[in-house]
């Protein structure tokens, strides 16, 4: 093993080369020499789960969409545009910055993959819009995002930590976006799906959620590996930071959800759904959830939406119990193209 790693110790990754003022000989990522087996495990999972929104038959939701009032249509469009903003931030700043702070060469490329898939998530909402919404509805929703202060505050809150000098705080912030902030928006499609509305759209959200679960798990794992090397004092300091930031975001989230969902009868349940996932996020970092059962009580029909057709072990690509459709190819002849 010593000889196997000799070249590794005498070289730098391309990222290290750029960070160290262009010093040293470059090495390539070697998937046959993995220091942390979790890297390989997560890489295999995220590549096995690869999907694209164009494969989901969202057009099957058009009849359901037309049955909704304009108020509900506008709410859905605003909610998904808000989610698009968060995924835009995560794809272009949050996950990209984690490459700089990676512990292994493999972690670098995993976060590059995460950034790409979050870009796919942002594109997915565009697929929903182009299928269900008018151009006017889409434009109005994007204008609403720019002008809505409660949304802007929560969207901007994590960016200073992404780009700051503390790698661990950046890691926490990058995990908070997919681990907590998105769930208030996720509540709406699950609520609708539990009432037999927009089922294919909800399937897209389940696929996004499946990716987020892996993302959160991996970021939490890497966070814990770094924290365990710190002194007790530093560990306590980091815990205070995590909880303080979480409570700050919860207040921002409550303000946003109250404004977004006002008049639709789902504000309190959406907040409980968010806080439930805040507790899950903290557990993922190795901390106990401080929230009570009452604060995190989710209705059974919403829990059913989280599990039905969305279990991480489910074969989304089989077409069984999911709307993910794979194309079937057929050889053609010249005459087939004579229209």
UniProtKB/Swiss-Prot annotation:
Reaction equation(s) it catalyzes: a 2'-deoxyribonucleoside 5'-diphosphate + [thioredoxin]-disulfide + H2O = a ribonucleoside 5'-diphosphate + [thioredoxin]-dithiol
Pfam families given in the database record: Ribonuc_red_sm
Required cofactor names: Fe cation
Molecular function in Gene Ontology: metal ion binding; ribonucleoside-diphosphate reductase activity, thioredoxin disulfide as acceptor
Cofactor: how and how many bound: Binds 2 iron ions per subunit.
CDD domains registered for this protein in UniProt: RNRR2 (cd01049)
Residue numbers binding Fe cation 1: 87, 121
Active site, per annotation: 125
UniProt keywords, alphabetically: Deoxyribonucleotide synthesis, Iron, Metal-binding, Oxidoreductase
Family matches, as InterPro entries: Ferritin-like_SF, RNR-like, RNR_NrdF-like, RNR_small, RNR_small_fam
Biological-process GO terms, alphabetical: deoxyribonucleotide biosynthetic process
Residues involved in Fe cation 2 binding: 215
EC number: 1.17.4.1
NCBIfam families documented for this protein: PRK09614.1-1, PRK13965.1, RNR_1b_NrdF
Function: Provides the precursors necessary for DNA synthesis. Catalyzes the biosynthesis of deoxyribonucleotides from the corresponding ribonucleotides.
Name used for this protein in its record: Ribonucleoside-diphosphate reductase subunit beta
């Amino acid at each position: 093993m010593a000889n196997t790693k000799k070249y590794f110790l005498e070289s730098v990754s391309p990222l290290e080369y750029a960070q160290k003022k262009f010093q040293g000989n470059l090495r390539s990522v070697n998937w046959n020499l993995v220091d942390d087996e979790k890297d390989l495990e997560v890489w295999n999972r995220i590549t096995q789960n690869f999907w694209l929104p164009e494969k989901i038959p969202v057009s099957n939701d058009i009849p359901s969409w037309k049955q909704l009032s304009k108020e509900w249509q506008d709410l859905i469009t605003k909610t998904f545009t808000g989610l698009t903003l968060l995924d835009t931030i995560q794809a272009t700043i949050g996950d990209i910055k984690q490459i700089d702070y990676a512990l292994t060469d493999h972690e670098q490329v995993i976060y590059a993959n995460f950034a790409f898939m979050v870009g796919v998530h942002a594109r997915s909402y565009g697929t929903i819009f182009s299928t269900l919404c008018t151009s006017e509805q889409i434009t109005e929703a994007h204008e609403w995002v720019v002008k809505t202060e409660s949304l802007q505050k929560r969207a901007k809150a994590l960016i200073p930590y992404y780009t700051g000098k503390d790698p661990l705080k950046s890691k926490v912030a990058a995990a908070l976006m997919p681990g907590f902030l998105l769930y208030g928006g996720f509540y709406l499609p699950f609520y609708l799906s539990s009432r037999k509305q927009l089922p294919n759209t909800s399937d897209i959200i389940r696929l996004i959620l499946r990716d987020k679960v892996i993302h959160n798990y991996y970021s939490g794992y890497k966070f814990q590996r770094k924290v365990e090397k710190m002194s007790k004092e530093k560990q306590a300091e980091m815990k205070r930071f995590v909880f303080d930031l979480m409570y700050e975001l919860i207040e921002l989230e409550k303000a946003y959800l109250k404004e977004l969902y006002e008049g639709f009868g789902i504000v309190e349940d959406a907040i409980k759904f968010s806080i439930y996932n805040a507790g899950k996020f903290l557990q993922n970092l190795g901390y106990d959830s401080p929230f009570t059962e009452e604060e995190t009580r989710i209705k059974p029909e919403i829990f059913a939406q989280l599990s039905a057709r969305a279990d991480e072990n489910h074969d989304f690509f089989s077409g069984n119990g999911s709307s993910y459709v794979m194309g079937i190819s057929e050889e053609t002849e010249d005459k087939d193209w004579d229209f």
